[in-house]
């Protein structure tokens, strides 16, 4: 279900300034073949106030994106209210509950994982979240690197995704990063 990508979200504060970043690799896999190495699986939403990224089935992920973006617009960019309403709406539709995709959504204050089953999970530390086949590698690397206060947030995301790309056969090191 979650093959062929790694997405990492990272938010926090450095030097009194809040930051939020999301990064992902570019690999798309169909079965056991790499069909694209430079796909974009991250995007900014609501006037560049929210970042998002997906892992899983591309068609299902776009369904997730569209639905979430519509709710985010209706809530005027309030991420917390949007994920709650997203989950409520999700659970009402039998088709939606079977989507094979996950998303990370974050802003300067919150970071959430949205699943294709309608679950909403706030990152344990409200700081780092990762999804996809290389998600556990990226999450582990990001948590370790986060303990070094001197590392810039963009560099942390980049290095964590590189580690995931080196270890996970469904993840490459063609990394794209967005930040608020």
Swiss-Prot record:
It is found in: Cytoplasm. Its main location: cytoplasm. It comes from the Bacteria. The keyword Phosphoprotein does not apply. It catalyses: ATP-dependent cleavage of peptide bonds with broad specificity. Its EC number is 3.4.25.2. Allosterically activated by HslU binding. The keyword Hydrolase applies. Keywords: Allosteric enzyme, Cytoplasm, Hydrolase, Metal-binding, Protease, Sodium, Threonine protease. One of its GO terms (cellular component) is HslUV protease complex. The active site is at residue 5. GO terms for molecular function: metal ion binding; threonine-type endopeptidase activity. InterPro entries: ATP-dep_Prtase_HsIV_su (IPR022281), Ntn_hydrolases_N (IPR029055), Proteasome_sua/b (IPR001353), Proteasome_suB-type (IPR023333). One of its GO terms (biological process) is proteolysis involved in protein catabolic process. Na(+) binds at residues 165, 168, 171. It is an enzyme of class 3 (hydrolase). A double ring-shaped homohexamer of HslV is capped on each side by a ring-shaped HslU homohexamer. The assembly of the HslU/HslV complex is dependent on binding of ATP. Protease subunit of a proteasome-like degradation complex believed to be a general protein degrading machinery. Belongs to the peptidase T1B family. HslV subfamily. HAMAP family: HslV. This is ATP-dependent protease subunit HslV.
């Amino acid at each position: 279900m979650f093959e062929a990508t790694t997405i990492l979200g990272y938010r926090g504060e450095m030097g009194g300034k809040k930051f939020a970043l999301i990064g992902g690799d570019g690999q798309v896999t169909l079965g056991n073949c790499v069909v694209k190495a430079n796909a974009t699986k991250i995007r900014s939403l609501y006037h560049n106030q929210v970042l998002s990224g997906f892992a899983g089935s591309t068609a299902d992920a776009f369904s997730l994106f569209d639905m979430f973006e519509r709710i985010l617009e209706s809530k005027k960019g309030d991420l917390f209210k949007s994920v709650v309403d997203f989950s409520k709406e999700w659970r009402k539709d039998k088709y939606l509950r079977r989507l094979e995709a996950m998303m990370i959504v974050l802003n300067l204050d919150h970071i959430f994982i949205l699943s294709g089953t309608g679950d909403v999970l706030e990152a344990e530390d409200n700081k780092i979240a990762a999804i996809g086949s290389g998600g556990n590698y990226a999450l582990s690397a990001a948590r370790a690197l986060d303990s070094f206060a001197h590392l810039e947030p963009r560099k942390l995301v980049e290095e964590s995704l590189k580690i995931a790309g080196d270890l996970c056969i469904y993840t490459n090191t063609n990394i794209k990063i967005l930040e608020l």
